[in-house]
Amino acid sequence: MDYQDAGVNIEAGRSFVDKIRRSVESTYNAQVLGGLGGFGGYFELPTGYENPVLVSGTDGVGTKLKIAQALNRHQTIGIDLVAMCVNDILTSGAKPLFFLDYLATGKLNPQQLSDVVTGIVEGCHLSDCALLGGETAEMPGFYGVGEYDVAGFCVGVVEKANLLDGSQINIGDVAIGLSSSGVHSNGFSLVRKIVEVNGLSWGDRFESLGNQTLGEVLLTPTQIYVKPILEALKSGIEIKGMAHITGGGLPENLPRCLNNNQSIKINSESWSILPIFQWIANMGNVATAAMFDTFNMGIGFVIIVPKNQGKTSIEWLKSQGISAYEIGEVIEGNRELVGL
């Protein structure tokens, strides 16, 4: 008996690395030292920083994976994975430098996982960061055949003097909401339950969703905000704080960028709720408060700017292809959302 008899194919693992090598190395830049396959990845800090601060983040995609696996569509999951990590560290003002991934599966399917890595590579290109390394674990008996899980890890850098920690935010500043591309990567356990209870399938089409299949709409990849936000910072827009709207929605995530004596008065009618959220609320009989507590509701990222830069910020973001709205104002309070 050998390792392969136990369900672990080492040769398939080597072949998989060879299959993805060229794609992964397309993300490399001058700061990457060495190639794929070492015990560690080497990255030289870029020059030009007086007091560089490294910012790290890690995340996964949750049960959105169940839909991808049911439909055998894995190409966009990698974009979701990168987005969940880089958008998080972006809130501090950090530029992503490099990304690492962890893929675990019951039986290594080279094409399936290559599709996942293709998405990770695309996400890295969209974030201007290197895919520095990763780990692929074949775990028979732990995951079923065709099942896999993913986790991502990223590191970025920001000048210490430019680190956004909320201390710059003042009463009267405004919250600018950047549109999401859809459900992103949170709330899928509730979505899956609604589909199950209603006896639906991922291939069902709905007029309210533009006659796309439910699976197509739900697998829309998470928006990556890195390039427009970093360009906004360079353009002179005075961004004082940022929030990535993930699990817990606006009520949980937006107050995280505030000081202890501040809240945000929100105007939930200042943007249009995406059709997929109307569909979820109707099909699942989900109360409005629960929807906002679970989903991004069409706002995937928020920046805090001075009131006199609100309109300018919105127009600038629109010029970059991002729809944006003034969704609220900073008021005195206790780090909570008022008005929902």
UniProtKB/Swiss-Prot annotation:
GO cellular component: cytosol
Catalytic reaction annotation: 2-formamido-N(1)-(5-O-phospho-beta-D-ribosyl)acetamidine + ATP = 5-amino-1-(5-phospho-beta-D-ribosyl)imidazole + ADP + phosphate + H(+)
Transmembrane parts of this sequence: none
A Gene Ontology molecular function term of the record: phosphoribosylformylglycinamidine cyclo-ligase activity
EC top class named in words: ligase
Domain of life: Bacteria
Keyword terms: ATP-binding, Cytoplasm, Ligase, Nucleotide-binding, Purine biosynthesis
Record carries keyword Cytoplasm: yes
Biological process (GO), any one: 'de novo' IMP biosynthetic process
Matching CDD domains: PurM
HAMAP family on file: AIRS
Protein name according to UniProt: Phosphoribosylformylglycinamidine cyclo-ligase
Organism encoding this protein: Crocosphaera subtropica (strain ATCC 51142 / BH68) (Cyanothece sp. (strain ATCC 51142))
